[in-house]
């Protein structure tokens, strides 16, 4: 299980630090909108379908970082898996237990508790965001094959992306329409969230981006307006298709704003590229507020793991205060502004505090997937072009 001795790791990708911060913020936003009692309205659905791109962006970023770090050098795979699984499997098990307790399963008889725990560990069902850790573990397991595919098709990555796009669009249509061809395929279509092939294009796209990172960085810096314009068109198209499905085709808001929408495939890649553009532009400008961004990026996994617990606590407090019932009576525009502009940042900020503090304790690995940090993250102010790919 080895391909020689691993070489020195590649330089840190500072642009990805900002991507992580933005993506986690988008995740917190979509979960705040969808888990606070907001009226089932067209406006809420339109916001949700755009924010759902955060899921796919995570897998693009994961594959990009892996391919950049391990794509062109010898890797001892047993060491790779040991390090990666330690940082994912441990917090996965810990947070599964945390959310079981938070949901009241501590009252269950021991046998029922253990049965639920076993099922949640297998499926990621303890809380709605834990599927990402299961899929991440599948990516790590399959990364030797993913790397081989990217390397073997190095001169044909356009075709590889094209085939991946056709597959992803077809799969998204099947999931959205709940096709039932039979057997394991039906089980997959009806339960796609925690299965790696459900995100194949995003892993391929991230891997290709990591392989061609310098070229993509240079192109992005030279075509920033094009990327932003294409993303704006993509967002408008996403909302337009949502409105068509909701108002003309009679789909429910939940169905029309689902994460496995064919149009979300395009929207996710466009927003991912916009986040990358923001990252490389930030590095080019010398990384202003870099200590804040790097600290939030360093704690982003912990924020991701903890934010549903924060959201549960906030809604529990808001109920007796009458805020939740008021949200069902107030104009939806006002509610969405408060949810996105006030509540989501609060969830993010409150989730960040324990994540930042735990990074300096022995609990860091279990709670945030990172070894204990003894000093604050710091970054030099490198030359702009050199630092973009760092």
Where do the model's predicted regions map?
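Membrane-cytosol interface segments of multi-pass membrane proteins
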Residues: 1-169, 173, 321-390
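Signature aromatic-anchored transmembrane alpha helix within multi-pass, membrane-resident enzymes
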Residues: 165, 224-238, 291
């Amino acid at each position: 299980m080895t391909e020689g001795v691993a070489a020195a790791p590649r330089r840190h990708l500072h642009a990805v630090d900002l991507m992580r911060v933005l993506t986690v913020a988008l995740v917190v936003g979509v979960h705040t909108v969808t888990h606070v009692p907001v009226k089932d309205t067209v406006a809420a659905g339109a916001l949700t379908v755009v924010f759902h791109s955060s899921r796919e962006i995570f897998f693009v970023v994961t594959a990009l970082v892996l391919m950049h770090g391990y794509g062109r050098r010898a890797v001892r795979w047993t060491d790779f898996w040991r390090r990666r699984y330690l940082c994912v499997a441990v917090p996965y098990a810990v947070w599964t237990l945390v959310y079981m307790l938070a949901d009241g399963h501590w009252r269950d008889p021991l046998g029922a508790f253990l049965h639920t725990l076993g099922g949640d560990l297998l499926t990621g069902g303890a809380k709605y965001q834990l599927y990402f850790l299961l899929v991440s573990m599948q990516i790590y397991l399959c990364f030797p094959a993913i790397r081989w595919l990217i390397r073997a098709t190095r001169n044909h990555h356009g075709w590889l992306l094209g085939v991946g796009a056709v597959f992803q669009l077809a799969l998204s249509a099947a999931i959205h329409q709940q096709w039932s061809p039979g057997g394991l395929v039906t089980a997959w279509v009806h339960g796609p969230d925690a299965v790696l092939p459900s995100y194949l294009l995003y892993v391929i796209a991230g891997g290709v981006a990591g392989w061609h990172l310098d070229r993509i960085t240079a192109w992005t810096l030279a075509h920033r307006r094009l990327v932003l314009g294409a993303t704006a068109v993509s967002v408008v198209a996403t909302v337009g298709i949502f409105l068509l499905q909701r108002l003309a085709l009679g789909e429910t808001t939940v169905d029309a704003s689902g994460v496995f929408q064919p149009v979300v495939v395009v929207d996710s890649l466009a927003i991912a590229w916009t986040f990358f553009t923001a990252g490389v532009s930030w590095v080019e400008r010398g990384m202003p507020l870099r200590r804040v961004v790097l600290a939030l990026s360093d704690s982003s996994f912990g924020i991701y793991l903890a934010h549903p617990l924060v959201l549960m606590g906030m809604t529990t407090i808001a109920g007796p205060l009458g805020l939740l019932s008021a949200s069902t009576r107030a104009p939806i525009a006002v509610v969405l502004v408060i949810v996105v502009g006030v509540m989501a940042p609060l969830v993010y900020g409150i989730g960040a505090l324990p994540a930042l503090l735990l990074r300096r304790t022995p609990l860091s690995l279990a709670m945030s997937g990172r070894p204990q940090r003894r000093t604050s993250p710091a970054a030099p102010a490198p030359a702009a072009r050199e630092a973009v790919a760092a």
